[in-house]
């Protein structure tokens, strides 16, 4: 009994001692707002020697085609673009005659890393289907950097990806923008300064998941009620924090609102820090989501899948909302039936921000061919779509959807040197990416397999130390 009393007294003493550790000199607690970026990028540009690409045929990602043009790369950036650039400092030259150059391709809808290969249930980490609203979860905490699918996408010229949670929930959580580079940690892949995103989902998926459990939502009206309830709570949470921070000098920390990870993400959307990426197929539901965003004062950055985008293309253009679409994937469920192959071309023709995506670990390897299919469909119906314009769907327009248009998506002076050299016309089924640079460093070379990372999984099961440097 004496030992128990002694332990009790010691524990009380330690509690009293450490309870004062957070106090300032005046006896009050330190006032701190929630950290908006608790898991910052640790990505570092890989050092490389400056080099000069000569005599290239370039699709610049902005809708232009440049002939016999040179690109000077230095310190991870595009330093100069022009004809017959002089090499006054003996930079390494790459003769790009008879080849094509494009910006690195951008896929704004991927689940690689959260649905990693091999596709076992143990690797199914993309849908936190335990509540219709899970804004508190972050895709980056599920990403496995060792997913062997990343290297396959790199071989297809994809240099930047938005990794999203799945669409089983009304509000599924935060997405993360990654550079397609080898890394032990996901933070080593995170694109520095990229805005966070929020995945929302319309339609069949949430009502199917929770309706099967006799929960709300089980209908589309239940979907809308669920979103609105969450945004009402978020507005109240934001107001509580605004009131506290605006008057924090007069209030002790004990009066600060209790932190809520779910509400913090939604508050970030309301403050414009987090971009909404909204899975939505039907035209009528897209308009409903736009109306709701105006009700609560947030902005939708992009609709994803957007099967019926062609029906509301002028509205998307007016609202400044990107439409992220497949070339010809449709009909796999009821809400995906009313699709036309000219969808992307028609949205682009209306002046909206048209973007192509994969949502698939196979299609991402051939995103250039997906662009070609969508371009051909538009051309057949009489729209004037050049290959240079179509490329914007996976370059500058995609960069806009990520909020990174000032850094990637085009061959321009000052942009990141994310560049793909193709061994032929990028839209030919016979063409492959020959070299892929990210921030000026070569990460893929079709003629030098040692350049490209090999995922640990692809090495097979080895004895410790076997066949390892």
Q: Which residues does each predicted region cover?
A:
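Polyanionic/metal-chelating signatures
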Residues: 149, 154-302, 432, 438, ...
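C-terminal cap of metal-dependent C-N hydrolases
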Residues: 56, 400, 412-456
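Histidine-rich, glycine-flanked metal-binding segment
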Residues: 35-36, 40-48, 58, 62-102
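Divalent metal-coordination and catalytic microenvironments
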Residues: 56, 71, 76, 98, ...
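His/Asp/Glu-enriched, well-ordered alpha-helical/loop segment
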Residues: 41-42, 117-118, 124-130, 134-137, ...
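Bacterial N-terminal signal peptides that target proteins for export
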Residues: 1-10
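C-terminal motif of bacterial Sec signal peptides marking the signal peptidase cleavage site
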Residues: 18-20
């Amino acid at each position: 009994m004496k030992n128990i009393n002694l332990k009790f007294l010691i524990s009380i003493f330690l509690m009293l001692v450490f309870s004062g550790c957070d106090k300032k000199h005046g006896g009050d607690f330190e006032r701190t707002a929630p950290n908006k970026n608790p898991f910052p990028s640790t990505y570092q540009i890989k050092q490389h020697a400056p080099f000069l690409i000569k005599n290239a045929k370039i699709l610049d990602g902005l809708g232009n085609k440049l002939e016999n043009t040179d690109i000077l790369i230095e310190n991870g950036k595009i330093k100069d673009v022009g004809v017959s650039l002089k090499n006054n400092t003996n930079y390494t030259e790459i003769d790009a005659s008879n080849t094509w150059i494009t910006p690195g391709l951008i896929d704004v809808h991927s689940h690689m890393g959260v649905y990693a290969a091999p596709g076992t249930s143990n690797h199914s980490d993309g849908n936190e289907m335990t509540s219709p609203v899970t804004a508190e979860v972050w895709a980056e905490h599920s990403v496995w950097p060792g997913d062997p699918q990343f290297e396959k996408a790199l071989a297809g010229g994809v240099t930047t990806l938005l990794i999203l949670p799945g669409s089983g929930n009304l509000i599924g959580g935060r997405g993360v923008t990654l550079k397609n580079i080898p890394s032990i940690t996901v933070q080593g892949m995170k694109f520095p300064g990229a805005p966070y995103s929020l995945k929302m989902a319309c339609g069949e998926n949430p009502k199917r998941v929770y309706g099967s459990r006799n929960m709300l939502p089980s209908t589309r009206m239940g979907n809308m009620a669920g979103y609105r309830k969450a945004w009402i709570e978020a507005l109240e949470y934001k107001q509580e924090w605004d009131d506290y921070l605006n008057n924090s000098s007069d209030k002790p920390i004990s009066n600060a609102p209790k932190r809520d990870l779910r509400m913090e993400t939604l508050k970030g959307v309301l403050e414009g820090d987090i971009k909404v990426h909204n899975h939505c197929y039907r035209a009528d539901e897209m308009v409903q989501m736009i109306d709701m965003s105006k009700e609560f004062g947030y902005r939708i950055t992009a609709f994803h899948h957007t099967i019926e985008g062609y029906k509301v293309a002028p509205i998307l253009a007016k609202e400044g909302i990107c439409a992220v679409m497949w070339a010809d994937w449709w009909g796999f469920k009821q809400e995906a039936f009313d699709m036309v192959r000219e969808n992307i071309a028609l949205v682009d023709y209306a002046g909206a921000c048209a973007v192509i995506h994969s949502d698939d670990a196979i299609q991402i390897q051939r995103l250039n061919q997906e662009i070609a299919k969508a371009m051909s469909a538009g051309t057949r119906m009489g729209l004037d779509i050049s290959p240079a314009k179509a490329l914007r769907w996976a370059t500058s327009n995609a960069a806009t959807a990520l909020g990174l248009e000032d850094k990637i998506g085009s061959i321009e002076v000052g942009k990141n040197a994310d560049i793909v050299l193709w061994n032929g016309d990028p839209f030919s089924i016979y063409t492959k990416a020959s070299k892929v640079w990210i921030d000026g460093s070569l990460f893929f070379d079709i003629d030098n397999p040692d350049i490209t990372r090999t995922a640990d999984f692809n090495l097979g099961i080895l004895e410790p130390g076997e066949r390892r440097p």
